[in-house]
Amino acid sequence: MQFMLMHRDVPVLQFAIFDERNWVEIVDVLNAAHVPVNMLVQPHNRERALNEFIDHRFIPQSRSNYDVIKALYKANDAFELSLRSYMVSISDHYWVKPCDSSVTWADVNFYDNPIPDDQVLIGAIDTLHQYDPWRRTPNTSNNGTLRQIWLHRGDEILLSKAGELTFKQEPFNEAVVSDILAYFDVPYITYYLDYM
């Protein structure tokens, strides 16, 4: 099957998936000025760079609740999970659609469209029997080993992460570093601790 990598509503390139989703192959670059940054820094190996870019739009198998998420969404693998929401990420404006699809950025982005309450993905609530496995969410495109979800709180989009292992120290570390950077008045992203 062939897909289009989009940057908002700009068609960037067309690609095909081979080897049971283990490799994507570029069919045609339509707008080189809009390729992802990692493809610009690897100009002689664009296909490998595209595969790395696509791979970073999946929930990794190393995430502690990977199998639970697959079961919840009735998906075979992380690729299928991510593709259901067009591989939209909150971190950038790229997304993927089938070449014959008329879907637009306005239809799929989560800056302007609601983000579903996915707290079940980090174990904060236990309502699996009420969960719609076919709804679109940016949380099936989150890379990283920590359990995490994007959510709307008022006018803000926040990333909520859960700690792992015995001390659950990762969220604490990020909050402390955020405070240190604020003290030194350098650009940073604010992290704070909350309990869910």
Q: What does each of the following model-derived ranges do?
A:
Residues 1-135:
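Regulatory N- and C-terminal appendages and interdomain linkers associated
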Residues 107-196:
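Conserved ATP-binding subdomain of kinase catalytic cores across diverse folds
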